[in-house]
C-alpha cells in the first residue's frame, strides 16, 4: 500500500513538472515567433532600445518559468533514485545569440588563380599574413586583385603567435612564442619581389618576450625590402611598450608610412585591448614616430563596440593633436564566440558621416566603411600616389 502511494505521489510531481516545462517552452516559442516577426519587418536594423526591451521580457519569462518548475518539480531524492530523467534542450530563444549581420557585410568566398598563387607562395616561404590570422573579410578581394588592381597582402612578421591577448583579436597567443626566424627578412623580400607589388604592408604580433620586442627584426625586414625592389613600405607596428628608442629604430628604417592602431576610443581601451596597451601609450608612439622622421603616420579605429558619437569625435580630435595623418574606420567583426560581442552594426550613413568629420579636421586621408581595415588596398593606392607626388616635388626642389 505504501509503495502504491509513493508511486502516485511521484507521478503527480512529474505531471506538475511536465506542465511547468510546457509553460517555459510555450513562452520561449512565443518569444521566437515574435523575433521572427520582428526580423520580417527589418529585424537586422532594430535599434538597441527595442532589442534590450525584448531581452528583458524574455529574461522575466525565463525566471518565472524556472521558479514554477522549482515549486512543483521533483525533489532531490527523485533525481538521486533516478526516477526522473531530466534532459531538456534549451529553447532557441535562450541560446547564446549572435547579432545578425546586415546585407552590406556579406562577402564572396575567396578564390581564383591570383588568390591561389599568393597563398601557395606564402606557404612555400613559411610566411604568415594578418589577412588569414585575423580572419580579414577582405582577403579574397585583396588577394584576388579585382577590378584590374594589383593584388595585395599584408605580411605578418615575427611569427603567428602574439604575447598579448586583446579581446577582439583572433591571432594565437602565448607567453613564450617560438623564436624569431632569422631567414624571415630575406624570405619576405623574396616574396614581394616575385609578386611585383608597388606597395606592401608589414605588420607583426607583439613580442614582449624578446629584449627589443622585435624592433630590430622589423627594421631589418624593411631595409631588405627597400634594397631588393622598388616598393613603398607601410609598417603597422606594435606599441613596443612605449619605449621610444625602439619606436625610433623602426621609424628610421626607411619606411614610407608608420602605422600603429589605437583600435578603439579612449573610454573603451581597458575593455577591448590587452592590459599592457592603452590610449596614451599609443598616442606617444605615433607622436615619437613623427618626431623621428616618419613622414606619414596612420592609425585605425574599430566601430561597433559600444562607443558613442561624441567619443569617436573626441578621439579624432586627439589624433589630430598628435599630428596623425591618416585614419581608417571599420566595423568590428567578432572572430569567434570567445571574443567580444558586437554591440551594434554601424550603418553606411554613419561611416560616411565620420569620414566627413575627419576630413573637415584636416586628416590627409580617411577611409571609412564597414569592410575597411587598417590595411586595405584602396587606401594603399591613395597613399602610394601621395608618396610618389611628394618624392617628385622633393626631387624637383633638389634640382
From Swiss-Prot:
SMART domains, A to Z: Elp3 (SM00729)
The Radical SAM core domain, residue ranges: 145-364
Alphabetically ordered keywords of this record: 4Fe-4S, Iron, Iron-sulfur, Metal-binding, Mitochondrion, S-adenosyl-L-methionine, Transferase, Transit peptide
UniProt KW Mitochondrion keyword: yes
Catalytic activity: [[Fe-S] cluster scaffold protein carrying a second [4Fe-4S](2+) cluster] + N(6)-octanoyl-L-lysyl-[protein] + 2 oxidized [2Fe-2S]-[ferredoxin] + 2 S-adenosyl-L-methionine + 4 H(+) = [[Fe-S] cluster scaffold protein] + N(6)-[(R)-dihydrolipoyl]-L-lysyl-[protein] + 4 Fe(3+) + 2 hydrogen sulfide + 2 5'-deoxyadenosine + 2 L-methionine + 2 reduced [2Fe-2S]-[ferredoxin]
Phylogenetic lineage: Eukaryota, Viridiplantae, Chlorophyta, Mamiellophyceae, Mamiellales
Region (Disordered) location: 31-58
Ranges of Basic and acidic residues composition bias in the record: 31-41
A Pfam family that the UniProt record links to this protein: Radical_SAM
Subcellular location: Mitochondrion
Presequence positions on this chain: 1-30
Protein name: Lipoyl synthase, mitochondrial
Transmembrane segments annotated in the record for this chain: none
One Gene Ontology CC term in the entry: mitochondrial matrix
Source organism, top-level taxon: Eukaryota
SUPFAM superfamilies, per database record: Radical SAM enzymes (SSF102114)
Cofactor: [4Fe-4S] cluster
Cofactor note text: Binds 2 [4Fe-4S] clusters per subunit. One cluster is coordinated with 3 cysteines and an exchangeable S-adenosyl-L-methionine.
UniProt source species: Ostreococcus lucimarinus (strain CCE9901)
Amino acid at each position: 500500500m505504501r509503495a502504491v502511494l509513493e508511486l502516485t505521489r511521484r507521478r503527480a510531481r512529474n505531471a506538475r513538472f511536465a506542465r511547468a516545462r510546457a509553460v517555459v517552452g510555450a513562452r520561449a516559442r512565443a518569444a521566437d515567433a515574435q523575433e521572427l516577426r520582428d526580423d520580417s519587418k527589418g529585424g537586422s536594423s532594430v535599434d538597441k532600445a527595442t532589442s534590450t526591451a525584448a531581452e528583458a521580457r524574455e529574461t522575466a519569462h525565463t525566471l518565472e518559468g524556472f521558479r514554477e518548475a522549482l515549486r512543483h518539480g521533483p525533489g532531490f531524492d527523485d533525481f538521486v533514485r533516478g526516477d526522473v530523467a531530466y534532459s531538456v534542450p534549451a529553447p532557441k530563444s535562450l541560446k547564446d545569440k549572435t547579432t545578425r549581420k546586415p546585407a552590406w557585410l556579406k562577402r564572396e568566398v575567396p578564390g581564383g588563380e591570383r588568390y591561389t598563387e599568393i597563398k601557395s607562395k606564402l606557404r612555400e616561404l613559411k610566411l604568415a599574413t594578418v589577412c588569414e590570422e585575423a580572419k580579414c573579410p577582405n582577403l579574397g578581394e585583396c588577394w584576388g586583385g579585382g577590378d584590374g588592381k594589383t593584388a595585395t597582402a599584408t605580411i605578418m612578421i615575427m611569427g603567428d603567435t602574439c604575447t598579448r591577448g586583446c579581446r577582439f583579436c583572433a591571432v594565437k597567443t602565448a607567453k613564450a612564442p617560438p623564436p624569431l626566424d632569422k631567414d624571415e627578412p630575406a624570405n619576405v623580400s623574396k616574396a614581394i619581389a616575385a609578386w611585383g607589388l608597388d606597395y606592401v604592408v608589414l605588420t607583426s604580433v607583439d613580442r614582449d618576450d624578446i629584449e627589443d620586442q622585435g624592433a630590430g627584426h622589423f627594421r631589418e625586414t624593411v631595409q631588405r625590402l627597400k634594397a631588393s625592389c622598388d616598393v613603398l613600405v607601410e609598417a603597422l607596428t606594435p606599441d613596443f611598450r612605449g619605449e621610444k628608442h625602439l619606436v625610433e629604430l623602426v621609424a628610421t628604417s626607411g619606411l614610407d608610412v608608420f602605422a600603429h592602431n589605437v583600435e578603439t576610443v579612449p573610454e573603451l581601451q581597458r575593455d577591448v585591448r590587452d592590459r599592457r596597451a592603452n590610449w596614451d601609450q599609443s598616442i606617444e608612439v605615433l607622436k615619437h614616430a613623427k618626431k623621428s622622421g616618419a613622414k606619414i603616420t596612420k592609425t585605425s579605429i574599430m566601430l561597433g563596440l559600444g562607443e558613442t558619437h561624441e567619443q569617436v569625435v573626441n578621439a579624432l580630435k586627439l589624433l589630430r593633436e598628435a599630428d596623425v595623418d591618416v585614419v581608417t574606420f571599420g566595423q568590428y567583426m567578432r572572430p569567434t564566440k570567445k571574443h567580444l560581442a558586437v554591440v551594434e552594426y554601424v550603418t553606411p550613413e554613419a561611416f560616411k558621416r565620420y569620414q566627413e568629420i575627419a576630413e573637415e579636421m584636416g586628416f590627409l586621408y580617411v577611409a571609412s566603411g564597414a569592410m575597411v581595415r587598417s590595411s586595405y588596398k584602396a587606401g594603399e593606392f591613395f597613399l602610394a600616389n601621395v608618396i610618389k607626388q611628394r618624392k617628385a616635388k622633393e626631387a624637383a626642389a633638389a634640382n
